[in-house]
Amino acid sequence: MKRDHSNKLSCFPQNIDGRICGYDNDNLKMPNKIIEMGLLPDTLFKILYQAPFNGPLYIEFGEEKSRIALRVEEAQFIIVESTTA
């Protein structure tokens, strides 16, 4: 898949391997905690589950396979691409 900067983590499908490309720099309200949690560019991830009614995303990421829940509103700041052929 070609790098497409319109792909946001909030719209990424479940159980597909992906890579964080960067952040939506047009929006200056991006929470610093996204970076502090370790969701850095080139980090590999997979969305394991999304809670019902557009709830938080449960994400596994990094070499240590860390897991966090991330609000959809925060996931909209993260630009991603698929690493699956």
What residue ranges belong to the model's regions?
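PDZ/PDZ-like peptide-tail recognition elements
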Residues: 4-11, 66-71
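A residue-level detector for short acidic-glycine micro-motifs
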Residues: 11, 22, 47-49
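Short, charged beta-turn/beta-strand-edge "cap" motif at the junction between a beta-strand
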Residues: 24-26, 49-55
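Short alpha-helix capping/helix-loop boundary micro-motifs
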Residues: 29-33
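C-terminal structural segments of small proteins and small subunits
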Residues: 58-85
